[in-house]
A protein has these predicted regions:
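Glycine-/small-residue-enriched capping loops at alpha/beta junctions
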Residues: 1-175
């Protein structure tokens, strides 16, 4: 499994070669924020319309696969409902990560980009979100290439962890 960072800016997304975009949002998160909000804007409000019409709610366990249209550089868009934001904690974060990784694996997504659950609303810090993501990833055999979407300050915090991981791997290879 490879992990790298992707800016939460549309210009950065336009540089992406392929893969899928995985979006997460809470049932009480309106308007959509972070990556989901940017994708909604790029899709001319399609996600907001789906929510308004009752076809998408953000309920826990909800998932929806959409074509990306011409305005997103991804092969597909997969949306995950996280349920209510109240009570969100690390245990719930971990369960969402396991579920998202399982669905991505079953869908045979070899490459995908996502903003970790709770990052858009600030319910989990960037550094901790990546630490827990890597911890969950270490416990399974899935090998997808993952681009973690975050803002500049979040990327800065996450980059430290990725550099440390890389140094650990290099040291292990030399030993």
């Amino acid at each position: 499994m490879g992990v790298h960072l992707l800016g939460n800016e549309l210009s950065r997304w336009d540089e992406v070669d392929s893969g899928s975009l995985l979006l997460t949002f809470f049932s009480d998160e309106r308007p959509l924020r972070g990556a989901a909000g940017l994708a909604d804007w790029r899709l001319c409000g399609r996600l907001s319309r789906l929510i308004k019409r009752g076809h998408l709610s953000g309920a826990v366990g909800e998932k929806l696969l959409l074509p990306p249209g011409r305005r997103l550089p991804f092969r597909s868009v997969l949306i995950f409902g996280l349920g209510p934001s109240q009570g969100f904690n690390e245990e719930i974060y971990r369960s969402h990560v396991r579920w998202i990784r399982e669905v991505a694996d079953k869908a045979r997504l070899g490459t995908y980009a996502l903003q970790p659950p709770g990052r858009a609303t600030g319910l989990i810090g960037a550094r901790r979100a990546l630490e827990l993501w890597l911890d969950e990833a270490a416990q399974d055999s899935r090998t997808a290439e993952v681009a973690i979407i975050d803002n500049q300050s979040g990327q800065k915090d996450m980059a430290e962890i990725l550099r440390y991981q890389q140094k650990k791997r290099q040291a292990a290879e030399r030993a």
